Structures are given as structure tokens and as C-alpha cells.
Amino acid sequence: MNIKSIQNLVYEAMNEIKTITVEQAYEKVKDNECNLIDIREINELDNSGRIEGASHIPRGTLEVHLDPNSSIFQKGQLDQNKEFILFCAGGVRSALAVKSLKEMGYEKISHIDGGFAAMSNSSFKIV
């Protein structure tokens, strides 16, 4: 049995996806050019706070929420014409999530290098 490590999975994902800096993400949010999606679990939001204006879709249900054939598809809540920018606590889960959504057919999608940890030391407002 050949089981890949999480480190290998993330490395492979990072070679296939778009990663942006916190500063790039902030400019896109400020200019209303994207959907900012927080994929952390609810307890992480409760413990650390939320980024103002970010939509929350937990990693565990992300693909279901973004499947147009799903009964819980985020119809009307996210602008499908704008880039989707995902973040988690540090960038690992969001990298894997972006890879998964690319495989579903999403094209305008990226994740934030450093995730919430990096965002909390930036111009983003935590509420």
C-alpha cells in the first residue's frame, strides 16, 4: 500500500493551484472583485474571530455547498462571475480545497498564503 503523506498532497496541490498573498487578497476584496470564503470550522471562528465580509463554508461541506446540483448550493449567495478566494487557518486545507474545486470545474479560484494567521496581521478587519 502506497499512502501519500499530507505534506506530499499539499505539495502536489500547490503546484496545480493559484496562491495569492494577503495583500493581493485585500485589494481584490476592497475592489469587490471576489468571493472571500472562510473554510475553517465554526469553533475556529468562535475562538479566533471572523474576517469581516467573508462567507463561511466549512471545509467538510465545501464541495456540497458549491455543487450546482446540490440542494444546499449557495445559489445567489456567491457571485459565480467573480474569483473565489479561500482561506483556512494556515493555508493547508485551503490549498487542498482549491485543488478539489478545480477538479469540479471551478476556474477562477485561489487561496491565501498563510491563511487566517497571516490575515490577522494585515489590513483585514477581524470581527
Regions found by a protein language model. Name each.
Residues 1-34, 42-83, 92-127:
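Rhodanese-like catalytic fold shared by cysteine-dependent sulfurtransferases
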Residues 87:
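Short, surface-exposed ligand- or partner-binding patches at beta-edge/loop junctions that are enriched
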